[in-house]
């Protein structure tokens, strides 16, 4: 009979609910999501303070931008999940307000289901509108976002881990990796949430930091983020269980992998456009500052 370590049984010691306020449960995922936003904002503030020649953005503009894109993330993430993953998408489309209704039969159950790729689409759309309205450089704001998001993303995936969701695939009985497995319903599964936190968050951030000094053209960091994230997500999906309502598609690919390939192709084509852009010059920076 197989014995399990404390790590294998870690879910026995982690309650998805951090605490309750009256009858409302506050989940770890919610706490981690807020932490992710704050970390990303703090990193962005650090870059516009210490690398202002690369990111000529004021604190006031950054705060305003953050509010705009956060609305885009919430709307895009939820709508994206409903359209791509939810088996009840047609019911939601008939009553779209139900996408954001945290109550079921008068009981608070929260809002379940959030798509990263949908959130990214909402983020970009909100950024485009913001930069158009405020007459700002879309590429500079997106470069700043690209290098600020990854470490915040780490907290989001840890939140998934604490919330007992987005489980990894079952580890084969003869695999030497069973020691790192997490026991879920009697089966050892890969801690794919932590794999994603490391690969899509920490590794991507390190790569972008290494690229920063060479990224002279606006949009370079955005393109690099798209490529790095898409590749990391594609690989990590091999350790992550596909959504039960979706399953696997052509060549055994998950929906996450298909969307990552789409993201990779878009990033490459975007890179061709960025390649012909002029480097950020001191004259352009001065012009940006005068407009503020």
From Swiss-Prot:
The chain crosses the membrane at residues 24-44, 65-85, 110-130, 136-156, 192-212, 219-239, 256-276. One of its GO terms (cellular component) is plasma membrane. It is a multi-pass membrane protein. Pfam families: LGT (PF01790). It comes from the Bacteria. GO terms for biological process: lipoprotein biosynthetic process. Catalyzes the transfer of the diacylglyceryl group from phosphatidylglycerol to the sulfhydryl group of the N-terminal cysteine of a prolipoprotein, the first step in the formation of mature lipoproteins. This is Phosphatidylglycerol--prolipoprotein diacylglyceryl transferase. The lineage of its organism: Bacteria, Pseudomonadati, Campylobacterota, Epsilonproteobacteria, Campylobacterales.
